[in-house]
Amino acid sequence: MADKLIKATAKDGQVRIIGAITTELVNKGIEVHKCSPTGAAALGRMLTAGSLMGSMLKSEKDTITIKIDGGGEAKGVLVTAYPEGKVKGYIGNPLVHLPLNQNGKLDVGGAIGKNGNITVIKDLGLKDPYIGQVPIYSGEIGDDLAYYFTVSEQTPSAVGLGVLVDKDLSIKASGGFIIQMMPGADELLADFITYRLEEIPSITELISKGMSIEEILEFIFEGMDLKILEGIVPEYTCDCSREKIDRALISIGYKDLKEIYDEGKTEELVCQFCNEKYFYDHEKIGELLRIMNN
């Protein structure tokens, strides 16, 4: 089933829903980073979460960055997302490998660890970005983001994220949802939705059956007057460029850049999101120094 992200409401606007299938998106991300199965599941969940939360931004110039690091062998995962469904990310240790957990599944929680925080940074074009941070709840990422929404944004939420890794290490199914109760929503409705989520199969199981994201949400919210508002195609993409790397080098300051110049070596800089390589020889670094002097 093709990747798609949709926004919807249920029960006369009492519930806000964002759901997505992200199989192709996550496949591209793990191909870039050459992930192990556990690394793929961790990065894939974060990329899916990023695409969902990015779609909640209001302005096309807004960005959101989500970072989780609990001291585990994954060495942290970071994603940056945009309103139109584009997302990029990286994992500190893409080859992280742990035994299966007690449920016989990839141990994402163990790879992430629990001794740390999940941090959400929203750049909304204001003087300072919004930064929200909460302790890691489980390391499974979905639970941690639900805890973040409830504590930091005071919005009771359910977050479901799933990544099914195939035997050939490709992604067989990936997707997720964020379900939020709006102010004034019926508490019994929240309890019913919680019960419903506990009873249904996992989102990756539903995707594997060939269900579209519309069909999945119709299934979850059966009899709850689901209204689909809009849809976009989420995508793994990196916006790095020579100009951005130039600005990053200039930002380290004249003194430090001059020291690099005086060494006379060609420097190789690698984008952590897409592994694109940028080479700066003696002449190119000299050009940047001249720009800084003007």
UniProtKB/Swiss-Prot annotation:
Database matches in InterPro entries: Heat_shock_Hsp33, Heat_shock_Hsp33_C, Heat_shock_Hsp33_N
- Which SUPFAM superfamilies does this one have? Hsp33 domain (SSF64397), HSP33 redox switch-like (SSF118352)
The SS bond pairs are C238-C240, C271-C274
A GO cellular component term found in this entry reads:
cytoplasm
Q: Where does it live in the cell?
A: Cytoplasm
* Listed Pfam families: HSP33
Keyword annotations for this protein, in alphabetical order, are:
Chaperone, Cytoplasm, Disulfide bond, Redox-active center, Zinc
Assign the protein's first listed, main location to one coarse class.
cytoplasm
Q: Which GO terms describe its molecular function?
A: protein folding chaperone; unfolded protein binding
The alphabetized list of GO BP terms reads:
protein refolding
Q: How is it modified after translation?
A: Under oxidizing conditions two disulfide bonds are formed involving the reactive cysteines. Under reducing conditions zinc is bound to the reactive cysteines and the protein is inactive.
- Matching NCBIfam families: PRK00114.1 (NF001033)
Q: What does this protein do?
A: Redox regulated molecular chaperone. Protects both thermally unfolding and oxidatively damaged proteins from irreversible aggregation. Plays an important role in the bacterial defense system toward oxidative stress.
Q: Which family does it belong to?
A: Belongs to the HSP33 family.
Name of the protein in its database record: 33 kDa chaperonin
